[in-house]
């Protein structure tokens, strides 16, 4: 399109479809001077680029149904409500996981405590066995010492009896020798009692001592037997008491072992609950992501946004 403009000064006029510019100048004598048409190259380039860009942009499909603002507000409210519920479920799962962590820590401590108590009871049982061995050793040593004293005393008594018996036998032999001598001399009127009257006090004294020693020997032997008879039940009672305590200790060990097993089982349950809560949290997050994505696609489709 070409526009001719008459004016006192040069005027340039453009339009949406202007492809040339004509300049006319009116002089003082009224003569119109026409200049050559000049083509607007920049405008032509811009117009070609605009037409090219319009040809590359796809045309959007116009929705066949208009947007209902009320339904849009309701949809937004439903989205917010659903997201609130899902977020609440996520928070509950997180709290449950925290409780599971605390429960697992508690069960770990309970397991460790039960194992420590079990070890302590086993150590106590070992100490009781050592105590039983010590008591048995003490009783055996006491009995041995008492027997040794008794034997030493009896040996001493036996030696004294041997000396006394030797003295008595020696005097009897002297009496017999004296009797033989007097019989050989023809003096048969002297009796054995008359000859033995000289050593009779020593004989009687030695015989009395011998009787006392024999009595003392029997008493010493009886005391040793009585002491052994008394110490053996005491040792047996001590061993029985230790065995009873050892039985209690073994029962405590079994109980602690059961408690440790229960604590380990509870720990496993807590770990399983934690795994379940983790999976539940992942599922909730996946649902939130899917729900938001679906709602976003729906809104884009409603507004015609690609």
Curated annotation (Swiss-Prot):
Primary residence: secreted
Superkingdom in the source lineage: Bacteria
Keywords: Host membrane, Membrane, Plasmid, Secreted, Transmembrane, Transmembrane helix, Virulence
Places the protein is found: Secreted; Host membrane
Protein's job: Component of the type III secretion system (T3SS), also called injectisome, which is used to inject bacterial effector proteins into eukaryotic host cells. YopB/SctE and YopD/SctB are inserted into the host membrane where they form a pore and allow the translocation of effector proteins into the cytosol of target cells. Involved in pathogenesis. Essential for the establishment of Yersinia infections in a mouse model system, but not for the targeting of effector Yops. May modulate the host's immune response at a distance from the site of infection.
Family: Belongs to the SctB/YopD family.
Subunit architecture: The core secretion machinery of the T3SS is composed of approximately 20 different proteins, including cytoplasmic components, a base, an export apparatus and a needle. This subunit is involved in the formation of a pore, called the translocon, in host membrane. Interacts with YopB/SctE and YopE. Together with YopB/SctE, forms a multimeric integral membrane complex with a mass of between 500 and 700 kDa. Interacts with its cognate chaperone SycD.
Protein name per UniProt: Type 3 secretion system translocon protein SctB
Organism: Yersinia enterocolitica
Gene: sctB
